[in-house]
Design a protein with these regions (language model features):
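Boundary/junction segments of secreted and surface-exposed precursor proteins
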Residues: 1-24, 231-239, 243
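Short, flexible loop/turn elements at secondary-structure junctions
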Residues: 26, 46-49, 145-149, 164-169, ...
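Active-site-proximal structural scaffolding
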Residues: 38, 124, 136, 155-158, ...
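Active-site-adjacent substructure of cysteine-protease-like catalytic cores
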Residues: 120-176
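Lectin-like carbohydrate-binding module/patch detector with strong preference for beta-trefoil
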Residues: 227-402
Length: 402
Protein backbone atom coordinates (compact mmCIF):
# COMPACT_ATOMS: atom_id res chain seq x y z
CA UNK A 1 0.00 0.00 0.00
CA UNK A 2 1.49 3.40 -0.96
CA UNK A 3 2.28 5.80 1.85
CA UNK A 4 -0.38 8.45 2.42
CA UNK A 5 1.08 11.78 1.34
CA UNK A 6 -1.60 14.21 2.56
CA UNK A 7 -2.80 13.79 6.13
CA UNK A 8 -5.71 15.79 7.51
CA UNK A 9 -7.61 16.01 10.75
CA UNK A 10 -10.29 18.34 12.08
CA UNK A 11 -12.81 18.78 14.86
CA UNK A 12 -16.30 20.14 14.17
CA UNK A 13 -15.38 23.54 15.59
CA UNK A 14 -16.67 26.43 13.46
CA UNK A 15 -15.32 29.94 14.18
CA UNK A 16 -18.59 31.38 12.85
CA UNK A 17 -20.69 29.39 15.33
CA UNK A 18 -18.34 28.73 18.24
CA UNK A 19 -16.28 31.92 18.15
CA UNK A 20 -17.40 35.46 18.93
CA UNK A 21 -18.71 37.97 16.38
CA UNK A 22 -16.60 40.82 17.78
CA UNK A 23 -12.81 41.21 17.78
CA UNK A 24 -10.36 41.04 20.66
CA UNK A 25 -10.25 44.83 20.93
CA UNK A 26 -10.33 45.10 24.72
CA UNK A 27 -8.31 47.69 26.59
CA UNK A 28 -7.48 46.71 30.17
CA UNK A 29 -6.85 49.48 32.70
CA UNK A 30 -4.11 48.10 34.92
CA UNK A 31 -3.20 51.16 36.98
CA UNK A 32 -4.16 54.82 37.39
CA UNK A 33 -1.22 57.11 38.15
CA UNK A 34 -1.45 60.03 40.65
CA UNK A 35 -1.71 62.47 37.73
CA UNK A 36 -4.76 60.61 36.40
CA UNK A 37 -2.96 58.90 33.52
CA UNK A 38 -3.99 55.29 32.97
CA UNK A 39 -1.65 52.38 32.35
CA UNK A 40 -3.35 49.95 29.97
CA UNK A 41 -2.77 46.63 28.25
CA UNK A 42 -4.47 45.39 25.12
CA UNK A 43 -6.60 42.31 24.61
CA UNK A 44 -8.13 39.34 26.41
CA UNK A 45 -7.22 36.70 23.84
CA UNK A 46 -6.70 33.89 26.33
CA UNK A 47 -10.02 34.59 28.01
CA UNK A 48 -11.85 34.61 24.68
CA UNK A 49 -10.15 31.36 23.63
CA UNK A 50 -10.95 29.62 26.91
CA UNK A 51 -14.59 30.78 26.95
CA UNK A 52 -15.11 29.79 23.32
CA UNK A 53 -13.76 26.32 24.07
CA UNK A 54 -15.94 26.15 27.20
CA UNK A 55 -19.04 26.63 25.03
CA UNK A 56 -17.89 24.19 22.37
CA UNK A 57 -17.13 21.38 24.81
CA UNK A 58 -20.48 21.96 26.54
CA UNK A 59 -22.24 21.56 23.20
CA UNK A 60 -23.63 25.09 23.38
CA UNK A 61 -23.36 28.01 20.94
CA UNK A 62 -21.27 30.96 22.04
CA UNK A 63 -23.18 34.26 22.48
CA UNK A 64 -23.43 35.89 19.04
CA UNK A 65 -23.65 39.56 19.95
CA UNK A 66 -22.20 41.73 17.18
CA UNK A 67 -19.51 44.37 17.56
CA UNK A 68 -21.80 47.25 16.50
CA UNK A 69 -23.94 46.79 19.61
CA UNK A 70 -21.17 48.50 21.58
CA UNK A 71 -20.05 51.01 18.96
CA UNK A 72 -17.63 52.66 18.87
CA UNK A 73 -15.65 50.37 21.23
CA UNK A 74 -16.73 47.15 19.37
CA UNK A 75 -16.45 44.97 22.49
CA UNK A 76 -18.67 44.44 25.54
CA UNK A 77 -17.83 46.93 28.32
CA UNK A 78 -16.46 45.84 31.68
CA UNK A 79 -19.99 46.13 33.12
CA UNK A 80 -21.03 43.21 30.88
CA UNK A 81 -20.94 39.69 32.34
CA UNK A 82 -19.17 38.33 29.25
CA UNK A 83 -16.35 40.89 29.44
CA UNK A 84 -15.84 40.05 33.10
CA UNK A 85 -15.82 36.33 32.25
CA UNK A 86 -13.11 36.93 29.65
CA UNK A 87 -11.01 38.60 32.34
CA UNK A 88 -11.51 35.68 34.73
CA UNK A 89 -10.64 33.09 32.11
CA UNK A 90 -7.64 35.12 30.93
CA UNK A 91 -6.31 34.91 34.47
CA UNK A 92 -7.04 31.18 34.48
CA UNK A 93 -4.95 30.82 31.33
CA UNK A 94 -2.00 32.53 33.00
CA UNK A 95 -2.20 30.42 36.17
CA UNK A 96 -1.22 27.21 34.39
CA UNK A 97 2.11 25.45 34.25
CA UNK A 98 2.31 25.83 30.48
CA UNK A 99 1.91 29.63 30.64
CA UNK A 100 5.55 29.90 31.75
CA UNK A 101 6.49 29.14 28.14
CA UNK A 102 5.30 32.60 27.15
CA UNK A 103 8.28 33.88 29.13
CA UNK A 104 10.88 31.15 28.57
CA UNK A 105 10.31 30.85 24.84
CA UNK A 106 10.44 34.64 24.45
CA UNK A 107 13.94 34.54 25.94
CA UNK A 108 15.23 31.65 23.79
CA UNK A 109 16.40 31.71 20.19
CA UNK A 110 14.62 30.07 17.29
CA UNK A 111 17.56 27.76 16.66
CA UNK A 112 19.02 25.07 18.85
CA UNK A 113 21.97 25.69 21.13
CA UNK A 114 24.28 23.33 23.00
CA UNK A 115 21.63 23.04 25.70
CA UNK A 116 18.20 23.82 24.21
CA UNK A 117 16.34 22.77 21.09
CA UNK A 118 15.09 26.30 20.44
CA UNK A 119 11.60 27.51 19.56
CA UNK A 120 11.55 26.01 16.05
CA UNK A 121 12.29 22.43 17.15
CA UNK A 122 10.19 22.70 20.32
CA UNK A 123 7.22 23.63 18.14
CA UNK A 124 7.66 21.11 15.34
CA UNK A 125 9.02 18.16 17.31
CA UNK A 126 7.12 18.43 20.59
CA UNK A 127 4.09 20.71 20.39
CA UNK A 128 2.82 20.00 16.88
CA UNK A 129 2.50 16.24 17.59
CA UNK A 130 0.48 17.12 20.70
CA UNK A 131 -1.85 19.25 18.59
CA UNK A 132 -2.32 16.43 16.08
CA UNK A 133 -2.97 13.80 18.74
CA UNK A 134 -5.57 15.96 20.45
CA UNK A 135 -7.40 16.84 17.24
CA UNK A 136 -7.36 13.20 16.14
CA UNK A 137 -8.97 12.41 19.50
CA UNK A 138 -11.73 14.94 18.75
CA UNK A 139 -10.58 17.72 21.06
CA UNK A 140 -9.52 21.24 20.03
CA UNK A 141 -6.67 22.82 22.00
CA UNK A 142 -5.70 26.30 23.12
CA UNK A 143 -2.40 27.36 21.55
CA UNK A 144 0.00 29.92 22.95
CA UNK A 145 1.54 31.76 19.98
CA UNK A 146 4.96 33.27 20.55
CA UNK A 147 6.37 36.26 18.68
CA UNK A 148 8.32 38.05 21.44
CA UNK A 149 12.12 37.88 21.60
CA UNK A 150 12.57 39.53 24.99
CA UNK A 151 10.70 40.00 28.25
CA UNK A 152 9.59 43.52 27.36
CA UNK A 153 7.59 42.14 24.41
CA UNK A 154 5.90 39.20 26.15
CA UNK A 155 2.55 41.01 25.91
CA UNK A 156 2.71 40.68 22.10
CA UNK A 157 2.27 36.91 22.34
CA UNK A 158 -1.19 35.55 21.65
CA UNK A 159 -3.69 32.74 22.34
CA UNK A 160 -5.94 30.94 19.83
CA UNK A 161 -7.83 27.65 19.43
CA UNK A 162 -6.48 24.96 17.07
CA UNK A 163 -9.15 22.67 15.62
CA UNK A 164 -7.67 21.22 12.42
CA UNK A 165 -4.44 20.41 10.60
CA UNK A 166 -3.05 19.28 7.25
CA UNK A 167 0.37 17.77 6.61
CA UNK A 168 1.86 17.24 3.16
CA UNK A 169 4.59 14.69 3.69
CA UNK A 170 5.91 15.13 0.18
CA UNK A 171 6.56 18.88 0.42
CA UNK A 172 6.96 19.06 4.20
CA UNK A 173 4.31 21.76 4.51
CA UNK A 174 2.14 21.79 7.66
CA UNK A 175 -0.98 23.89 8.13
CA UNK A 176 -2.90 24.32 11.39
CA UNK A 177 -6.45 25.71 11.37
CA UNK A 178 -7.17 28.08 14.24
CA UNK A 179 -9.87 30.35 15.61
CA UNK A 180 -8.08 33.66 16.12
CA UNK A 181 -10.23 36.12 18.09
CA UNK A 182 -8.44 38.99 16.35
CA UNK A 183 -10.17 37.86 13.13
CA UNK A 184 -13.80 37.11 14.07
CA UNK A 185 -16.01 35.02 11.85
CA UNK A 186 -13.31 33.54 9.65
CA UNK A 187 -10.95 30.59 9.62
CA UNK A 188 -7.28 31.42 10.05
CA UNK A 189 -4.40 29.11 9.18
CA UNK A 190 -0.83 28.84 10.45
CA UNK A 191 1.50 27.44 7.79
CA UNK A 192 5.15 26.40 7.87
CA UNK A 193 7.19 24.87 5.07
CA UNK A 194 9.73 22.13 5.67
CA UNK A 195 12.73 24.42 6.03
CA UNK A 196 10.85 27.36 7.53
CA UNK A 197 11.62 28.25 11.13
CA UNK A 198 8.46 30.26 11.79
CA UNK A 199 4.73 30.07 11.04
CA UNK A 200 2.87 32.37 8.64
CA UNK A 201 -0.73 33.20 9.56
CA UNK A 202 -3.31 33.81 6.85
CA UNK A 203 -4.40 37.01 8.62
CA UNK A 204 -0.97 38.58 8.13
CA UNK A 205 1.00 37.70 11.27
CA UNK A 206 4.19 35.68 11.53
CA UNK A 207 4.74 33.64 14.69
CA UNK A 208 7.98 32.13 15.94
CA UNK A 209 6.20 29.04 17.24
CA UNK A 210 3.40 27.72 19.42
CA UNK A 211 2.71 25.42 22.34
CA UNK A 212 -0.36 23.63 23.70
CA UNK A 213 -1.75 25.39 26.74
CA UNK A 214 -3.08 23.60 29.78
CA UNK A 215 -6.84 24.05 29.95
CA UNK A 216 -9.59 22.99 32.34
CA UNK A 217 -13.16 23.48 31.07
CA UNK A 218 -15.73 25.50 32.97
CA UNK A 219 -19.50 25.21 32.60
CA UNK A 220 -20.60 28.27 30.58
CA UNK A 221 -23.59 30.51 31.16
CA UNK A 222 -26.26 29.76 28.55
CA UNK A 223 -28.92 32.44 28.12
CA UNK A 224 -30.39 31.09 24.90
CA UNK A 225 -30.12 28.04 22.69
CA UNK A 226 -32.25 29.68 19.99
CA UNK A 227 -30.58 32.93 19.04
CA UNK A 228 -32.34 34.60 16.08
CA UNK A 229 -30.64 35.66 12.89
CA UNK A 230 -29.57 39.28 13.28
CA UNK A 231 -31.59 40.22 10.17
CA UNK A 232 -34.89 38.76 11.41
CA UNK A 233 -37.61 41.43 11.52
CA UNK A 234 -39.43 42.05 14.79
CA UNK A 235 -43.23 42.42 14.58
CA UNK A 236 -46.28 42.78 16.77
CA UNK A 237 -47.40 39.37 17.97
CA UNK A 238 -43.80 38.22 18.43
CA UNK A 239 -42.54 36.95 21.76
CA UNK A 240 -39.11 38.26 22.68
CA UNK A 241 -36.45 38.00 25.30
CA UNK A 242 -34.62 41.32 25.56
CA UNK A 243 -30.98 41.57 26.56
CA UNK A 244 -29.57 44.68 28.24
CA UNK A 245 -26.70 45.68 25.97
CA UNK A 246 -24.39 47.14 28.60
CA UNK A 247 -24.59 44.31 31.15
CA UNK A 248 -25.84 41.34 29.10
CA UNK A 249 -28.64 40.51 31.54
CA UNK A 250 -32.21 39.76 30.49
CA UNK A 251 -35.40 41.81 31.05
CA UNK A 252 -37.38 39.84 33.60
CA UNK A 253 -40.39 39.96 35.89
CA UNK A 254 -41.79 37.71 38.60
CA UNK A 255 -44.89 37.57 40.77
CA UNK A 256 -43.44 39.59 43.61
CA UNK A 257 -44.40 43.20 44.48
CA UNK A 258 -42.14 46.13 45.18
CA UNK A 259 -42.02 46.98 48.89
CA UNK A 260 -39.73 50.02 49.06
CA UNK A 261 -40.81 53.43 50.32
CA UNK A 262 -42.86 55.38 47.78
CA UNK A 263 -43.64 52.40 45.56
CA UNK A 264 -47.02 51.75 44.01
CA UNK A 265 -46.66 48.09 45.06
CA UNK A 266 -46.92 46.63 41.58
CA UNK A 267 -44.99 43.60 40.28
CA UNK A 268 -41.21 43.86 40.16
CA UNK A 269 -39.36 44.20 36.85
CA UNK A 270 -35.64 43.42 36.94
CA UNK A 271 -32.74 42.17 34.84
CA UNK A 272 -31.87 38.52 35.42
CA UNK A 273 -28.51 36.79 35.01
CA UNK A 274 -30.02 33.44 34.09
CA UNK A 275 -32.70 32.42 31.62
CA UNK A 276 -36.24 31.16 32.20
CA UNK A 277 -39.83 31.71 31.11
CA UNK A 278 -40.09 34.85 33.26
CA UNK A 279 -37.96 36.60 30.60
CA UNK A 280 -40.57 36.25 27.81
CA UNK A 281 -42.57 39.29 26.64
CA UNK A 282 -45.32 39.49 24.01
CA UNK A 283 -45.18 42.57 21.75
CA UNK A 284 -48.69 43.98 21.33
CA UNK A 285 -49.56 46.81 18.95
CA UNK A 286 -51.53 49.88 20.04
CA UNK A 287 -54.47 51.63 18.42
CA UNK A 288 -55.73 48.52 16.68
CA UNK A 289 -52.39 47.59 15.09
CA UNK A 290 -52.73 44.04 13.81
CA UNK A 291 -50.46 41.20 14.86
CA UNK A 292 -47.70 40.62 12.32
CA UNK A 293 -47.07 44.33 11.71
CA UNK A 294 -43.35 44.95 11.27
CA UNK A 295 -41.96 47.32 13.88
CA UNK A 296 -39.51 50.12 13.18
CA UNK A 297 -38.09 53.29 14.67
CA UNK A 298 -41.01 55.30 16.08
CA UNK A 299 -43.45 52.39 16.47
CA UNK A 300 -45.38 52.21 19.75
CA UNK A 301 -45.96 48.87 21.47
CA UNK A 302 -47.02 47.33 24.74
CA UNK A 303 -45.09 44.47 26.35
CA UNK A 304 -47.08 41.74 28.08
CA UNK A 305 -45.25 39.46 30.50
CA UNK A 306 -46.26 35.98 29.41
CA UNK A 307 -45.81 34.17 32.73
CA UNK A 308 -48.04 36.51 34.74
CA UNK A 309 -50.09 38.25 32.03
CA UNK A 310 -49.15 41.69 33.36
CA UNK A 311 -48.01 44.69 31.31
CA UNK A 312 -44.76 46.65 31.40
CA UNK A 313 -45.61 49.99 32.98
CA UNK A 314 -44.15 53.15 34.44
CA UNK A 315 -45.56 56.26 36.08
CA UNK A 316 -44.17 59.70 36.88
CA UNK A 317 -43.46 60.43 40.53
CA UNK A 318 -42.97 56.82 41.64
CA UNK A 319 -39.34 56.20 42.66
CA UNK A 320 -37.43 53.06 41.76
CA UNK A 321 -36.20 50.99 44.74
CA UNK A 322 -32.45 51.63 44.59
CA UNK A 323 -31.52 54.65 42.48
CA UNK A 324 -34.71 56.69 42.99
CA UNK A 325 -35.25 56.97 39.26
CA UNK A 326 -38.72 56.34 37.82
CA UNK A 327 -40.05 52.92 38.79
CA UNK A 328 -40.79 50.29 36.13
CA UNK A 329 -43.31 47.60 37.10
CA UNK A 330 -45.87 45.20 35.63
CA UNK A 331 -49.60 45.91 36.03
CA UNK A 332 -52.83 43.98 35.49
CA UNK A 333 -54.61 46.39 33.15
CA UNK A 334 -52.86 48.31 30.35
CA UNK A 335 -53.52 51.97 29.62
CA UNK A 336 -51.40 54.82 28.24
CA UNK A 337 -48.83 54.20 30.98
CA UNK A 338 -48.02 50.87 29.28
CA UNK A 339 -47.12 52.44 25.91
CA UNK A 340 -43.45 52.29 24.83
CA UNK A 341 -41.95 53.93 21.75
CA UNK A 342 -39.21 52.08 19.90
CA UNK A 343 -36.05 53.99 18.99
CA UNK A 344 -33.75 52.07 16.65
CA UNK A 345 -30.17 53.11 15.91
CA UNK A 346 -29.99 54.79 12.47
CA UNK A 347 -33.82 54.94 12.37
CA UNK A 348 -34.04 51.50 10.80
CA UNK A 349 -36.65 48.76 10.99
CA UNK A 350 -36.37 46.76 14.20
CA UNK A 351 -34.34 43.64 13.51
CA UNK A 352 -33.10 41.07 16.02
CA UNK A 353 -29.51 42.31 15.85
CA UNK A 354 -30.38 46.00 16.24
CA UNK A 355 -29.67 48.17 19.25
CA UNK A 356 -32.90 49.78 20.46
CA UNK A 357 -34.32 52.01 23.17
CA UNK A 358 -37.80 51.58 24.62
CA UNK A 359 -39.04 55.02 25.62
CA UNK A 360 -42.04 55.43 27.92
CA UNK A 361 -44.46 57.51 25.87
CA UNK A 362 -46.19 59.28 28.77
CA UNK A 363 -42.99 60.48 30.48
CA UNK A 364 -40.30 60.27 27.74
CA UNK A 365 -38.12 58.22 30.12
CA UNK A 366 -36.07 55.38 28.63
CA UNK A 367 -36.18 51.79 29.88
CA UNK A 368 -32.88 51.53 31.71
CA UNK A 369 -30.81 49.18 33.85
CA UNK A 370 -27.52 49.30 35.73
CA UNK A 371 -25.47 47.17 38.10
CA UNK A 372 -27.46 47.88 41.27
CA UNK A 373 -29.05 45.03 43.20
CA UNK A 374 -30.60 44.35 46.59
CA UNK A 375 -31.51 40.93 48.03
CA UNK A 376 -34.80 42.22 49.42
CA UNK A 377 -35.91 45.11 47.20
CA UNK A 378 -35.06 43.55 43.81
CA UNK A 379 -34.81 39.84 44.75
CA UNK A 380 -31.05 40.12 44.31
CA UNK A 381 -31.49 40.97 40.64
CA UNK A 382 -30.44 44.06 38.70
CA UNK A 383 -32.64 47.15 39.02
CA UNK A 384 -34.66 48.26 36.00
CA UNK A 385 -35.88 51.85 35.86
CA UNK A 386 -37.18 54.51 33.50
CA UNK A 387 -34.46 57.15 33.09
CA UNK A 388 -35.34 60.71 32.04
CA UNK A 389 -31.95 61.30 30.41
CA UNK A 390 -30.20 59.18 27.81
CA UNK A 391 -27.07 57.09 28.28
CA UNK A 392 -25.55 53.74 27.29
CA UNK A 393 -27.58 51.89 29.92
CA UNK A 394 -30.76 52.49 27.89
CA UNK A 395 -29.84 50.11 25.05
CA UNK A 396 -31.48 46.70 24.50
CA UNK A 397 -31.28 43.97 21.87
CA UNK A 398 -33.24 40.81 21.08
CA UNK A 399 -31.94 37.63 22.70
CA UNK A 400 -34.76 35.32 21.51
CA UNK A 401 -37.54 35.83 18.97
CA UNK A 402 -40.54 33.60 18.38
Amino acid sequence: MPEQVLIRGAVAFDPEAHGFAFPNAFVNEVLTLPNGAKITTAGRCGGMAYVSLDYFLAGQPAPRWRADLWAPSRVPPDSHWLARLFTQRLRDSFFTGSAAKFVTWSMHSDDETWVFKGVRRWTKEEELPRVIRSIDAGRPVVLGLVVARDLASVGHNHQVIAYGYEQDRESGRTTVQVYDNNSPGRAVTLTSEQGQSDWTASNGHVWRGFFVQDYTPRRPRVLTRNAPDVKDRVSTGDTVKLSHVWTGLTLHSHDRPYTHRGTDGHQQVTCFGGSDDNDRWLLVGTGGTAAGTALRDGSVVRLRHLSTGRWLHSAAGVPSPLSGQQEVSAVDTPDATADWRIEVVDERPWTAGARVRLVHVATDAALHSHRATDPRLTAGQQEVTAYPGRDVNDWWTVLELS
